[in-house]
């Protein structure tokens, strides 16, 4: 999440600093490089060669966005949320199913098609087109039942994420 500002005193060496970041989950240092051609890259740094770096990566077939150093941490937080926090949410939901009597294997197996289907729909139709469920249907009774069944962190996470889902539902159904 570091910006090119980390290269302090770089002008003294007549050099230019850049921060180039793939928006990509690298979970295996020996295999992930094989599909990095699918990654979206961000580039931040000295204006002198920004366009050169952008063209270089676009020449490899990667989409590129130039961002400011001030936005680097917020950009990285968005990436961490959609990647790493999604893993945490999946783990929490598997735990919830285990608490309902599912084996660990069956909890994972049960949620996998739901996660894959929603991920594919989000990618294809964006969040507003992918949204389904009780908040999208304006089914307050089901949402309240869900909240009544939860406690602690699971309840707080459900509430907090529901606020964001409600924004998507309002975009999808502005007439409501």
Task: Identify the meaning behind each predicted range.
Residues 1-32:
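Rossmann-like NAD(P)(H) cofactor-binding subdomain of soluble oxidoreductases
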Residues 21, 76, 146:
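Histidine-centered active-site/metal-ligand motif
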Residues 14-16, 29-123:
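Internal alpha-helical scaffold of NAD(P)-dependent oxidoreductase catalytic cores
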Residues 1, 17-20, 61, 125, ...:
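A generic, residue-level signal for flexible/boundary positions that often mark functional hotspots
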Residues 108-176:
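NAD(P)-dependent Rossmann-like dehydrogenase/reductase catalytic/cofactor-binding core
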Residues 8, 24-27, 37, 76, ...:
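Generic, ordered loop/turn and secondary-structure boundary motif
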Residues 3-7, 50, 143:
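Short, well-ordered alpha-helical microsegments
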């Amino acid at each position: 999440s570091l910006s090119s500002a980390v290269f302090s005193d770089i002008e003294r060496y007549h050099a230019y600093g850049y921060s180039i970041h793939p928006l990509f989950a690298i979970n295996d240092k020996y295999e992930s490089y094989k599909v990095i051609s699918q990654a979206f890259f961000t580039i931040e740094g000295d204006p002198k060669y920004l366009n050169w770096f952008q063209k270089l990566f676009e020449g490899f077939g990667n989409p590129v966005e130039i961002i400011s150093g001030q936005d680097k941490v917020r950009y990285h937080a968005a990436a961490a949320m959609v990647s790493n926090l999604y893993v945490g949410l999946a783990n929490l939901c598997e735990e919830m199913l285990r608490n309902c009597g599912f084996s660990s294997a069956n909890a994972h197996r049960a949620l996998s098609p739901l996660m894959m289907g929603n991920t594919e729909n989000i990618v294809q139709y964006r969040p507003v087109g992918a949204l389904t469920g009780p908040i999208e249907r304006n089914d307050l009774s089901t949402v309240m039942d869900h909240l009544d069944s939860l406690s602690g962190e699971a309840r707080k996470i459900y509430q907090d994420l529901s606020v964001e889902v409600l924004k998507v539902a309002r975009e999808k159904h502005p007439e409501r």
